[in-house]
Amino acid sequence: MNQKSLTKLEFPKIIEMLTDHASSPGGASFCRRIKPMTDLNKIITAQEQTAAAFTRIVKKGIPSFSGCYAVSDSLKRLEIGSALSAPELLRIGKLLQTTTRIKSYGRHENADDQADCLDVYFEQLAPLSLIHI
């Protein structure tokens, strides 16, 4: 889609509104990079994911992503053998707590809950539930 069409459709304003609702800096950065899709299969998949997310939100409420910090710099420092500071360790701990909370949100509470296309994403989360902060 060309820039003139995007401007006419007020796409930048829509992206700005979406970014304002992001609950983490990483989420806001992701929102700013969104471009319109043109592949029909990808569009259909995204619509299915959106419908599944909406259904989960209606049933369970909006999940909290508070404590979702970018820790990639800390992980790079660890890879080269550096020690982490206390604030870095706390951020990693908070991220692990958030992971546990989101993994729990993704569980099906009872037999009535049907599997959906988002399950694969929740299954990939590996919280370390034995860590306490």
Predicted regions and their residues:
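Conserved amphipathic alpha-helical "coupling/scaffold" segments
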Residues: 1-131
